Amino acid sequence: MKNLFTKRNISLLVSMLVILFFYLLPDMTWGLSHEALWAIGIFFASLIMWINVSIDWPSLISLFMIGLLPSYGFNKMLQGSFGNSTVAFLLFTFILVYPLSQTNFVRRITIAFITNKVARKGPWHFVCFLFGAITFIGLFISPSVLFVAFLPFLEDIYKVLDIKKGSKTGNMLMMGTAFCISLSSGMTPIGHVWPTLAMSYFAGSEIGYPISAFEYMAFGIPTGIVLLVSLILIFKFIYRPDDIKSIDTAKAINLRGSIAKADVREKAIIAILVLVVFLWISPSLVKNAMPEYYALINGMTTAMPPLLGCILMFVISFDGKPLLNFKEATTKGVMWGSILMTAAATLVGATL
């Protein structure tokens, strides 16, 4: 019996009761139709399940409930969830950036940041460039993939600079890594769920103003930089690690020999990613000068560039091995829980 009263089961029960409560309310309660009340119930139930149960399979419950709405039905529900460009954009972007995490790109960029002359001037200079590197890389890679890829390298940094795990400086670098990865996931929509959801919801709202990837980044990146500076100031003046002066930043130069030069595969992957980003941001840059180009690319939705990038990576191969392995990318690179939640959240928002 104890297994019945778990947080999971109680949350599911409460969610169903919330839907039932709004379903049983009389028509025109609070001036809303019966179907609108039902939709509100589904919205609150979805929030309860996402917060207390999970973001993946409970999203299917939300989709199923919306499919029961008379004005939707299951055909329209499927078109509005898995058939919308937001979900396709996120899916293709997850697949596209996966090969990047399998290269030495993360280590290469980080080493370039933390071994320059300015970064080696002192411990806090080093910290600023390390957090800056993590934030920069996070602009293009999903947070979960980046954290898994970066953690082993952080261990190497500890060893080279003689930073002890559990020390105040060690804890600061670990916390800062997690914070910077989370922060960067809100600065661009590239492989990131929440910016993609926000852009989709705003485009489908009563205002109905579609936000391009460039417009989002023009606001998100400066805001993220301000928050990054604030984070470093909090660490320096409030957290104040007393052992940070023991870091010998000159040793960071030893990290340069830990990776080989970029091979042709890595260069090809980066070139394709640059092309995709160009197709995302270039229409907004030449909107007035080249309106036909703007209309053409924008009319293909934001899902077109990553789809093109995926196709190129599947086609291009070196030594008989394609840049992108479909099975590996879809099993290890795609955050399916995020895909399901995006599909459900997009549809719930449109329903409301």
Each language-model region and where it sits:
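Helix-loop interface residues and adjacent transmembrane-helix termini in multi-pass membrane transporters
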Residues: 51-54, 102, 210
